[in-house]
Amino acid sequence: MAAALPHHRLGGSETQVSRIALGSWRTFERMPRADAERLLAYALERGIDFLDDARYDDETGSAPIPTGYSEVLFGELLRAVGAEPAALTISNKLWWEFWPGQDAIGELEASLERMELDRLGLLYSSTLPAELPVPVAVEQIAAVLATGRVGAWAVVNWSAGDLAAATAEAERVAIPPPCAAQLPYSLARTDWVEDPAMDDALAAAGASLIPSAALAGGALSGKYADGASGRLRDELRDPRRSAALQLGSALRRPAAALGTTPATLAIAFTLLHPRTAATLIGATTPAQIDAAIDAVSLAQRLTAGDVAELRSLADLR
């Protein structure tokens, strides 16, 4: 039986999600199939029921199709581990890449076909192309919701202004406003989420926050101080990464004092935002799943003093 993880509601929707969401990105394509199956099965066993997938172009050079194999593989893995989609919140994204040649319903149906699913629990809208105004995008999403193949909708990396405009337009066309916004949020980057304009926009929509990039690409794990490999191994000398990498090393001291790891502590910070419903993570090992889940209980016992120390280390005021 899956371990119990706390759940939060996404905004004003009826959707309840585990406090940790597992993203797939292109991760599974880079792993041996057996390892990917074990990882997904372990995440489900630990109680993660919020799974994020999307259509990505192939970067391996070996996928049988140039784009969307990430979705094909995700669906195959779900079936291989015996997952019941109806018991999960599975999310995907509208990229609007082929707009207006492909509308929102067309993009959704293509993704569902590749995953071999009938329905999504959550559909995100990525940032809009210049030729797609917010009112038209919301009308497109209204048409998607009318199909019954999506439970709720949300946005990814939208500006506060566009989110506010979408909320107003949703009221005009009589659909629910976005229930969540997936935005970069970490000890290394708080500006987007903590901008007062974004807080106002989230409040107006009644939307939850889903932090992404919680470890700043792995920099906040502290592992690179020991020469570990990872996504940033080719960027360790990039000055744009230096602050996050230094912060990852600095987190070792407070993490040790709390009996945890820098990665778990960094994820816990994102869970403390009052609007956070779930923090989105990436993982390639069961240990990384455990570290993220440990952050849920850690967030519940961090004191105001602990948080003040973290913000001081990150030079956040």
Provide a role label for each language-model segment.
Residues 31-43, 100-115, 163-168:
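Short, acidic/polar
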Residues 1-88:
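N-terminal binding-site loop/beta-alpha segment at the start of enzyme catalytic domains
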Residues 10, 22, 51, 74, ...:
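Conserved, mostly hydrophobic/aromatic
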Residues 23-34, 92-102, 131:
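Active-site mouth loops of central-metabolism enzymes
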Residues 128-317:
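Beta/alpha (TIM)-barrel catalytic core signal, keyed to glycine-rich beta->alpha loops juxtaposed to Asp/Glu
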Residues 11-14, 45, 75-86, 109-118, ...:
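Acidic (Asp/Glu)-rich catalytic clusters
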Residues 17-21, 49-50, 87-93, 119-123, ...:
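Structural preference for beta-strand elements that scaffold enzyme active sites
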Residues 115-131:
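Active-site groove signature of glycoside hydrolases
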